[in-house]
Amino acid sequence: MKLIYTEMSYSMTEILVNEARKAADQGYRVFYIAPNSLSFEKEREVLTLLPERGTFSIIVTRFVQMSRYFTVESSPSKQHLDDTTLAMIFYRTLMQLKPEDLPSYGRLQNNSVFIEQLVELYKELKNAQLSVHDLTGLDHPQKQEDLIKIIELAETIMIQQDYNQDSPLQSFARAIKLGLLNNQLSKTVVVIDGFSRFSAEEDYLLSLLNNNCQEVIIGSYVSQKAYQKSFIKGNIYEASLHFLQDLAQKYHIKPVFATSNQVFKPAFSRLTQLFEATHDFSQVDWQLQKNDLDHFSLWQCHHQKEEIEHVAKSIRQKLYEGYRYKDILVLLGDMDAYQLQIGPIFDKFEIPYYLGKAEPMAAHPLVQFIESLERSQRYNWRREDILNMLKSGLFGCFDDSDIDRFEEYTQFADIKGFTKFSKPFTINSSRQYPLDFLNEMRQDIVLPLQELFKSQKQLGASLVDKLILFLKKIRLAENMQGLAQSQLEVEKNEEVWKRFTDILTSFHHIFGQEKLRLSDCLALIKTGMKSAQYRVVPATLDVVTIKSYDLVQPHSKPFVYAIGLTQSHFPKQIHHSGLLSDQERARINEIRNYRHFDIASAENSKKNHQTALSLFNAATKELVLSVPTVINETFDDLSPYLKELINFGLPLLDKGKNYLSYDNSDIANYKALLSQIIAINRQDLIEMSDQDKMFWTVVLRYLRKQLRKQQLELPTSDYRLSTKPLSKEVIEVCFPKGIPLKLSATALTVFYNNQYNYFLKYVLNLNKTESIHPDSRIHGQYLHRVFERLMKDHTQEPFDNKLKQAIYHTNQESFFQQVYQDNAEAEYSLAILEDIVRSTAPILQLNQNIQVIDQEKNFQLDMGNEILVHGIIDRIDQLSDGSLGIVDYKSSANQFDIGTFYNGLSPQLVTYLAALKQIAPHDINQLFGAMYLHLQDPKLDLVTFKQIDNTLVESIYKALTYKGIFSEVEKEHLSTGAYQTKNALYSNDELETLLNYNKYLYLKAAKHIKKGHFLINPYTSDGKTVQGDQLKAITRFEADLDMGQARRLVTLPAKEKKECFLTLMRKESHL
């Protein structure tokens, strides 16, 4: 064995490549070993250093891959054992054990986290060269007994199922120990680079290689100063020194110092020496030179997004200077926090990148499909799960529009559960859903699912066969092929599909002869899919590499950006969580000399020093270290390592907000520039110098020219909401000439509430989602129907009997039976409505001097000028003197207000009066009024009553009165009824004014509607708050920003309010 160490200013890779070349020139086969996370980059670096740029004699690989070169032909043809397969084996193991068999872990048998911890422990035991019987000295002896039972039974299952329990390194070591590879290894040289420690498994293999290979060469970075130190605790080279010292002591060899031809910039060397002096308690009498600072930058940004954008702009600048993407490395302090944001921002700046981390499969449509399938079975056909299966695009041959229609209907009819999905859809609504088509679609969905879900407990092999048959029926494989829209997606889908088939194969192999329920089968497959990961190789090598900062090696790239280096992430504090505590691992390690657990928390300090040292020397030309003040929406402090750099004299640059400028880094990329122009267009105006204004004027002129070529336009500012008028063609279709414009009192109210709301409801015909569950609209229909029946009953039966009959027959109508007998909640609503009917009905019994002459009367009121107003009058009453009036039932409190009417927000009663005047018989000229009847169950506060007497009854009936517009002429006839006439009496001339102004409101609205230009103008009564429908989700209206667009209502003081509004009405309607 040969041990080599060198200073950070030299290239260890070059030194080891030279050693490898010498061995290769002598005819030896050389394996150049790198850590798993660095083998790809190390291979490119090694091949670059070879003069011939490639050779068959030197193989750059990993320990595991190296073992396959020697054992691929002699290895037994056993099943491969991966993490998912291990989890299934442990699940089967726990199925065969009873809770009483496991005193410590019996309650965790079905816990997925516990199974994951068992998998991790089993892998750790293999890496540590330990067996479960070596787990002595645990806190509770019962733990070892339980673990022995579980793992021994699991290993028995592995043997029965012909799984290979040995790792590749164990198989390699066994072959060497048996002397099967002596001839090959005698002609082999092993070169090891990038390690600062070995696992027990690697350590054992290394001892065998040292005895059988021609030579083993190991290199590591250690300064000569550190190597000569006797006390190394806290030294930045502590990990490497322990590594070399342990090897030197074990193999009785002295490490040698070597140098490379390549010497890196002295600025990095001087920074390393300052860093070393800080931690070995020595002193230096010099500081960083001014030109050294050109190679380092310390950035501070407000949050992650700004930080990534500054990095992206800097990368674009490097490209402008002539460098390549492959010259740049981006390191992340927190991979999870940055992974979702860095991709879209780099795409915006058109920076190709490769994220050096396996992607989880959890977000793939196939995984979502499997999860929805499992949940559908477990939760009895829940609607959300069925729809998620369809939306994955992998179930059957349904268009998106068909799925949307199916979803709309199932939400309307509240279809959920197997019972409702299995029955034909019969309920319809005013929208007239295509029930025949929906039922055909329902059958295509239900039949294959029903066939699968009815599977009883049976052998796992049979369940897999039925699952595969189901997947064939729904054309899963064909649909999977149709998902991909790019070559990258094709590669991802192939990886996911391969993983899926591997999981099915493992399940069939392990549980084929075990009896399982379908729910357990689907849950196991789902768990395996959700925990699986895949990795896609970049299509080109010229990309920016992105990875976690703790995987970096010295001298990786010319330019390195390390971001997210906050106190919480730099240094990283690793704490192990599993079935064994660190204290238990330490006690086991004390007993076993060469077989040991890795205890991450015990090595945090020296590992973090080693990582910081590698990071500070990761670049060969320029190193940028950045820290956000807010990460994951949490404030964080500077890393202690960065504070040391500041003490060395490196300035901390506050990058601030990502303002646009006319620097090359801001304007060199068209896509990024366009996105930032849009961002500026949405912001408040900022102060600009004359030079800035001139520059951006020219840039905008150029951009608009380019956008016009692509038929694009810049969006308008959010703070100036405007709408475009409809085209002439659309106006002719929506409002054809010669056909009257149809309006109603409700439509007019919507128009004056917010014109854009009228456009949505009555031009685009957009409606809210319907539901079979009773709402205020259906409640109103029910109440109307009961009172209609009651008022039509002219028999001599007592009033209470009539009321009971009206309620009974209304409840028997098929529509109301479907609505109110569907569930307990609906039945409760019906009970409340019946109480309201019983409470309101007495008012009809009291008014014996009126006669109901018509109910639910449809009308069409010709307003002239091609306007037709339509509606339904709930009830037409006639007083004893022959005068007519209308009643409108309301489920909420309503009262006529002349100011609200003047502003167009309450035209209903006056419109009905106009309609009644038109349809009334010719011999009847007098109208006594139009009124609301609030259908309610009056609530009284008994605390306000001193005693229960007639005043209580009077208060109840006082709440049950007609409120609205009444004729002053009919005052005497109204005084004996339940009419609230105070401040509600109008003379005939005043009533005529109301009718004429009502016509004016319709004509004014119709004229505006026919122009086809609808404003976003919800009304405001005080100019401070907006009461109209703002439609924020559609219009993005904000009261504090867009108050100027709101329609201000005309308000007058209460004194002489009626007379003033009538005067205004006469003026505006030209009376």
Curated annotation (Swiss-Prot):
Q: Which domain of life is it from?
A: Bacteria
Q: Looking at the keywords, is ATP-binding present?
A: yes
- Assembly and binders: Heterodimer of AddA and RexB.
**What terms describe the molecular function in GO for this protein?**
5'-3' exonuclease activity; ATP binding; double-stranded DNA binding; helicase activity; hydrolase activity, acting on acid anhydrides
Q: Which keywords are on file for this protein?
A: ATP-binding, DNA damage, DNA repair, DNA-binding, Exonuclease, Helicase, Hydrolase, Nuclease, Nucleotide-binding
GO BP of this protein: double-strand break repair via homologous recombination
UniProt-listed Enzyme Commission number(s): 3.1.-.-
Question: What is known about what this protein does?
Answer: The heterodimer acts as both an ATP-dependent DNA helicase and an ATP-dependent, dual-direction single-stranded exonuclease. Recognizes the chi site generating a DNA molecule suitable for the initiation of homologous recombination. This subunit has 5' -> 3' nuclease activity but not helicase activity.
Q: Enumerate the PANTHER family for this protein.
A: RECBCD ENZYME SUBUNIT RECC
Matches recorded under InterPro entries: ADDB_N (IPR049035), DNA_helicase_suRexB (IPR014141), P-loop_NTPase (IPR027417), PDDEXK-like_dom_sf (IPR011604), PDDEXK_AddAB-type (IPR038726), Restrct_endonuc-II-like (IPR011335)
General remark: Despite having helicase-like domains, this subunit does not have helicase activity.
**What Pfam family is a match, any one?**
PDDEXK_1
Q: Which cofactor does it need?
A: Mg(2+)
The name under which this protein is listed is ATP-dependent helicase/deoxyribonuclease subunit B
| Family from the record | Belongs to the helicase family. AddB/RexB type 2 subfamily.
Key word Transcription present in the record?
A: no
